[in-house]
């Protein structure tokens, strides 16, 4: 069966205006007092590879209300999950629409037939997909899909859904949106592992158009795999005071080990030479990027786009991979590439792409 080739036409991006990275580091240091853990946190913060993280929470407000970063950090008791979802319901659609507006400056968005939204940091019904469709004035009959709670590879899953839609219906024009408000889930605990984990994450949104047009970046094949006996390494659960992240320190070593195994390399590369590809790797953290580089024996420059996005935005969960892909599309080094993200499972999802 001959299927239509699918293409990404452009990628729109948006982050909130509040840079809270240094605020968070100061707050986290206060939680630990003058302890050995504080010294270790400070050292690891400096080595994180992150310079900025953006939040829908205001950086500094005299009122220190629950919607300001300072107020959210210092509130006692910590804001409830319900309170955090109120902010998600208000702010997530706005950030998504800003990314779509950026996309509209690069690509014609008329005739949208499908909407696929990835979001793992909040829940609301009617869903954020319906809110976005209504705010954009899309047809009430538009076909919608919401990809939720999959974590950092949800953006790839959303692209995979769009890819299969266009392959089955070459006339389809699929708007894909990934929007995450990770900063809403500031931890209530003060342990080193909890505070270091939260230090990675920021807010962001990205949008792209997937269709069968002859131009753009072609989506060639998708793949996914789950590493055995790894389900406890990354967990994302709903708590009473936000969503709780468990991120084991074993993750980088497991990734590096898996990437050296023939089974995963065959799934990932499908016979291609890793050195001759562009690499859009989700920067889950500096050690994750380093693990992929070492596991695949890549030149350090190969993961420059991933490190650049990590430094300027932190880990924005599902939206991050689209930020990295946008960097590669703007300055490609090779004719083809691989996009990949790791998340709960421990699973890897990705796709091969090439220039049309």
Per-range role (PLM):
Residues 1-87, 173, 188-257, 261, ...:
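Condensing-enzyme catalytic core mediating Claisen C-C bond formation in acyl metabolism
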Residues 140-141, 147, 154-161, 178-204:
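Active-site glycine-rich loop that binds ribose-phosphate moieties when present
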Residues 2, 87, 120-121, 141, ...:
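Claisen-condensing/thiolase-fold acyl-transfer catalytic domains that form or cleave C-C bonds
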Residues 48-138, 149, 273-289:
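Conserved beta-ketoacyl condensing-enzyme motif
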Residues 49-50, 91-106, 161, 205, ...:
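Short, well-ordered amphipathic alpha-helical segments that serve as non-catalytic structural scaffolds
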Residues 124-130, 176-196, 223-240, 286-294, ...:
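Active-site-adjacent elements of ketosynthase-type condensing enzymes
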Residues 79-80, 110-114, 136-148, 188-193, ...:
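Glycine/charged-rich beta-loop-alpha catalytic/anionic-binding loops adjacent to active sites
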